[in-house]
C-alpha cells in the first residue's frame, strides 16, 4: 500500500523552500492462509486472518512567504519572488495543433509562454533572460513539469534553441 505525500503550508518560510517533516512509509496487507494438502497437493485454502498496516504519509513543509528580490536586466530592474530552472522550447501559432489563440484567450505570439499550470499559474508574469517579459498564457500537450514553450510570431526566425535556463516569477 503506497504512502501519500501531504503538504503543510508554512507562512514563516520563504515560498521557494520545502523541507521534509516526516518520511513516508508504505503500508502492508498481511494475509495468513491455511492450506490443506491431500496426497501432497493443495486441496483447500482458507484465509485465517488479514492484517493491514496503514501507510505513513510523507509530510513536506512548503514555505508560502513571498520574499521580493531585485535584479538588473537589459529591460531595467525587475522585482521577482521566485527563480526556477526550466527547459525552454519555442513555438508559434502555425505549429501542428496550434492556433492564433491561447488557452486563456490571448493572441499567441511573442510575450506569451505555454506552461504546466501545476508548476506556474496561468496569467503569471515572468522574466526570461534572452527573451524578455512574458505572461504564462498558454498550455500545451508536451508542456509538463518544468518545461515551458516560448511564444514567437514566427518560430522559424526566432533564433531560439531549446535549452535549460533560469526564469524569474514576477
PLM segments and residue spans:
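Extracellular modular ligand-binding repeats in secreted and cell-surface proteins
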Residues: 1-80, 142
Amino acid at each position: 500500500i503506497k504512502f501519500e505525500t501531504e503538504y503543510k503550508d508554512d507562512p514563516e518560510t520563504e515560498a521557494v523552500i520545502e523541507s521534509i517533516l516526516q518520511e513516508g512509509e508504505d503500508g502492508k496487507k498481511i494475509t495468513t492462509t491455511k492450506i490443506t494438502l491431500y496426497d501432497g497437493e493443495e486441496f483447500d485454502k482458507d484465509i485465517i486472518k488479514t492484517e493491514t498496516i496503514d501507510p505513513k504519509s510523507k509530510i513536506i513543509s512548503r514555505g508560502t512567504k513571498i520574499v521580493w528580490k531585485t535584479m538588473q536586466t537589459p529591460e531595467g530592474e525587475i522585482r521577482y519572488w521566485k527563480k526556477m530552472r526550466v527547459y525552454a522550447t519555442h513555438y508559434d501559432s502555425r505549429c501542428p495543433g496550434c492556433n492564433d489563440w491561447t488557452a486563456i484567450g490571448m493572441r499567441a505570439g511573442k510575450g506569451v509562454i505555454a506552461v504546466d499550470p501545476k508548476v506556474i499559474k496561468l496569467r503569471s508574469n515572468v522574466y526570461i533572460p534572452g527573451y524578455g517579459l512574458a505572461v504564462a498564457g498558454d498550455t500545451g500537450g508536451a508542456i509538463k513539469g518544468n518545461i515551458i514553450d516560448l511564444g514567437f510570431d514566427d518560430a522559424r526566425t526566432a533564433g531560439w534553441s531549446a535549452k535549460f535556463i533560469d526564469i524569474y516569477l514576477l
